[in-house]
Amino acid sequence: GIMVWQDFMFACAMYPGNPEFLENVKQEAVDNVIRLRNHPCIALWCGNNEIDAAWRGWGWKREYTQQQQERIFKAYTDVFHRLLPEVIEKYTDGDDYWPSSPMSGPEIGDHEIRPANRGDNHYWGVWHEKHKFEEYEKNIGRFISEHGFQSFPEFETVRQYTLLEDYDIESEIMSAHQRSGIGNLRIREYMGWYYQVPEDFGQMLYMSQVLQARAMRIAMETHRRHMPYCMGSLVWQHNDCWPVASWSSRDYYGRWKAQHYFTVKSFADLLVSPIEKDNTLQIYMVSDRLKSTSGKLTVCVLRLDGNGVVKEFKKQITVPANTSTVIWKEAVDGLLNGEKKEDVVVHVLYEDKTGKKYTNNYFLAKQKDMHYADRKSVV
């Protein structure tokens, strides 16, 4: 089933602390807690999004005197460390409450630690700080409660708000539907690192989704491989409130972006996840099942030109319940058997005893460096 992280509607701003406002907040919180409290899917109630982190480290304090800072922060603690937890305690049967996301603990001063050994993290090194996708592996917290990457919606959606003369991501109309000041630049930068950057407008829209899907697939698989140390991965974001370039996996019209397909696969109850470490390919099996499962693992190294199998391995395995396990590994040089990394793909298949199949493909080189054969296919 689906568990819900239920935010109160406070985000990225400091709020008043006068008695009238606090009473208004209290009554609204009571109404909504009573409205939602009987839903068994609610995992926790969170006071706000990113206010603790912002007040600590985003430079918000600089324009205020020490006295003003103390007054503003008292208003903050009155709402999120006193009023809201009191409402939760009174009107629920012991539901969990988290004052702000991200934090390292529930007390005042328990600011986010990166990467965290406790609490939750918002990891935006990939995107805002221009970390490479591989950095996800080096930034593992206990619960990654926000991470994401932008893409454009598909061409069919873009046609809803553009004319032919607008078919440029830097056009006035396209810019109006891109509300991140660094959005187009980041997409181009990252695309240049991993893919060939297309000049065609439609291909750029498409490749932005491929890029986003790759980023989020790596993130989701990384977080799951580190189970049980990391036990949460919340993707920003699911959908849109208008047709726009954004971090969503479904656009305003509900059309799935490439990322959404990978989300379904990456969050399946069983995940087969290959990764290269120290010139060795490791195959992880990640299970959310409460019982162990047995089946057959097949690892196949295929030439991209279609001229046969380079290496194939088959093994009967048992996947332990509710954890992540390295189930198979092999030196990359042995896998290649004299072939170049750019000429092959590693296809991994796990088939359980019921016949259900879980697959993944792993490339040993960047996509822009792969030697894909020109099949002269016309679609």
Model-inferred region functions:
Residues 45, 79, 86-89, 98-108, ...:
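Substrate-binding clefts and catalytic carboxylate motifs of secreted carbohydrate-active enzymes
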